[in-house]
Amino acid sequence: MRSASWTLESSSISLRSTMLSSDEIIRTVEMLKSENLDVRTVTLGVSLRDCAGDSAPEVCHRIQEKIRGQARDLVSTCEQISKKYGIPIVNKRLAVTPIAAVAESLAAEEYLQVARALDQAAAEVGVNFLGGYSALVQKGFTKGDRHLIETIPEVLSSTARVCASVNVASTRAGINMDAVSLMGKAIKETSLRTADRDGFGCAKLVVFANMPEDNPFMAGAYLGFGEPESVINVGVSGPGVVKKELERAIHSGKKLTLGDLSEIIKRTSFRVTRVGELIAREVAQALGVSFGIVDLSLAPTPTVGDSVGEILRCLGLDSIGAPGSTAALALLNDAVKKGGAFASSSVGGLSGAFIPVSEDLNLSEAVRQGHLSLEKLEAMTSVCSLGLDMIAIPGKVDANTVAAILADEMAIGVINHKTTAVRLIPVPGKDVGEKAVFGGLFGEAHILEVRNLNRSAAFVGFGGRIPAPITSISN
């Protein structure tokens, strides 16, 4: 049962500054009690830039000492503050400096030692996941970048908590197609190495365009080079809260337009964001580190009533993937951003609505029923906060086709000046109509059909870099 000691008076955020009426305070309490509102993740960013060295044992020792020193109290502090306010904090995580930079001087075979040191340190401090086995290669590779990408499959198949991410494109640099090709192969090999778990290793690997430096969500979190020595970034949740508010308004009998529904989502996002910032500032103050950002993203779970898909159904869609799905998602994403931006001046990360298929019951069911295709999901990613996320595809899909899917999604991000990402899971030995089970927050996914296999090899094989887009001619 949640603690009754949850009070706004004890926080540094006064009632006057929140501009909340008594009714809105009551609604916030209801959101916590019965509508699945939680803080999805408190992520501590830790700089490892001072951990570089000439040998793997030296680097590993420095990394472990740094993480133990910075993060030893993270979990206990989060639990204390969760109890104080009665607000669940689901995950406690770490994000570190991109390891490609930290381990630059090491040989490729030594990167696995570094990854295992990260995994051990994460286990010792009690966090769920550690992000930052990462490289930024949108314009080209360093030696360390290549070593890191080469070792991703082995690292993700032999560690429990380490997550990997690679930025292969940006609006200013274009798309590094050599990196895209390598990541297609890395995804396939990671899948094969974790075939006994339905390719689960790929759930810890994200390929990005315009990768944010302060994202608290896994598997794409890392500590950017412009970030402080250590910093708290928080990701809130709340699809269930938004759904309940929409249902309450729709069932009131009033004549509502989509503009009215957008306003309801906006007000709800405001309340959710205030809760997230309260927790973030309290944790940062208790740990003596900087407060960074609140990520506004509506992150679903496999739990009934905690689904972005259910929100789209509330907005009038009989099936997710039907005509109108992209417009409904655009409405939701924009309203969430507007409400959150009004609630906090420290909004960052991804901030919008996620559509991770395996982690959302309604999206997964839409795939099973044949209503939601890969092509429709790609269209929807042009207006939401992330991309093709947690999508299980047949194990027979070749590496070049995977790379071509990556390239398509990167192009959406590059041209539209937004973050896009791909987390595809080729499931070895399974095909359309079968199901992959990942467990926990990762949920389960019905295998999605990928059409036109083995028809993109020549395109991917050209390699090189797709140039950055012109910005003066906006159409």
Which ranges hold each PLM region?
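Anaerobic metallocofactor- and corrinoid-dependent redox/one-carbon enzyme cores
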Residues: 15-475
